[in-house]
Swiss-Prot record:
One of its GO terms (cellular component) is cytosol. It comes from Corynebacterium efficiens (strain DSM 44549 / YS-314 / AJ 12310 / JCM 11189 / NBRC 100395). The gene is aroC. One of its GO terms (molecular function) is chorismate synthase activity. NADP(+) binds at residues 43, 49. The lineage of its organism: Bacteria, Bacillati, Actinomycetota, Actinomycetes, Mycobacteriales. FMN binds at residues 143-145, 264-265, 308, 323-327, 349. It catalyses: 5-O-(1-carboxyvinyl)-3-phosphoshikimate = chorismate + phosphate. Reduced FMN (FMNH(2)). Pathway: Metabolic intermediate biosynthesis; chorismate biosynthesis; chorismate from D-erythrose 4-phosphate and phosphoenolpyruvate: step 7/7. Transmembrane segments: none annotated. This is Chorismate synthase. The keyword Amino-acid biosynthesis applies.
Amino acid sequence: MLGMLRWTTAGESHGQALVATVEHMPAGVPVTKDEVTYQLARRRLGYGRGARMKFEQDKLTFLTGIRHGLTLGSPISIVIGNSEWPKWTTIMSSDALDMEDPENVAAMSSGRGAKLTRPRPGHADFAGMLKYGFDDARNVLERSSARETAARVAAATVARSFLRETLGVEVLSHVVSIGRSEPYEGPTPTFADITAIDESPVRSFGKEAEASMITEIEAAKKSGDTLGGIVEVIVEGLPIGLGSHISGEDRLDAQLAAALMGIQAIKGVEIGDGFEEARRRGSEAHDEMVRDEDGVYRTTNRAGGLEGGMTNGETLRVRAAMKPISTVPRALKTVDMATGDAATGIHQRSDVCAVPAAGVVAEAMVALVLARAVLNKFGGDSLEETTCNIRCYLERIGKRLEFNDGE
């Protein structure tokens, strides 16, 4: 849609750089490299991350769209350089290689340059090789790698700043469970708890749940296996009316679900109590409304802050389920695409568990979708104009909920 907030990423896992582009962000939104660096560092958090996290440091460049720490309203480009690029210049070269050069022949015939012909079950390798006509799975896995999410986190840092400046809201996440660990079932955390969550080695908000998750990760390590889990994203303070009931594509819950399902390895999404709602009677499932001197509020929040595709003023709660990482140290059965013979899946440097990081990526996608919804509702070429539009809307909503008391 013309004028809609858009974000795209480019780049390969072992390429020269990843690039994040954000279009139609209003002018005047503050953005700093320190904030982007902070969010990228959060993405690397987590017990069970592999040694590659020590290598994949993030070198930032603001290429376009930002001047003196403020957005210009023009397309924003953020470049994340690959610190390991010198090791990959031949293997990932964009130029054709001279295969009469002995050095090129040596680089491409062994080690990391050798063709990868044994697709990993659960990964994009097999379908990607067939769909695009590749005889080397590297042409698939370089882009399908979760390393790409670093660019999304960078793009979302701009969206986070926009939400903070316009609505005063923050996006946070925590890990609910990992594998078969005992799930966290305590009170919903708030943004005031983010430091405690990030200091947890598994980004858990409960010590008992944390201990159970760590035990599960250690067991998976010992058995040469990998783990998935469930993360929850929480946003407090959203105004009533983001999204719409008018059409399916306008529904905010549909947009959030699509964005979260677009994260590598995510296999399920639920809003609020989600699938548990299907087990309840109608009298138990919905959030009743009451009114006091402060306005209308809900006695529960089973809907997770969304009804009819729109925010209803309650806390937004969205959960995403991540499957176990596809690169399993105890390699799984596959077929060698070069010979048709039985084989085991290729092994790439990987993690045992990336669920804590998935929460940060989920935050990023929720922030981007919410920023788009805010701009669709309130417009504005500048931060000042958008904020003014929001203020007028909130005043109108507030007056509507006064019900002409005293008149």
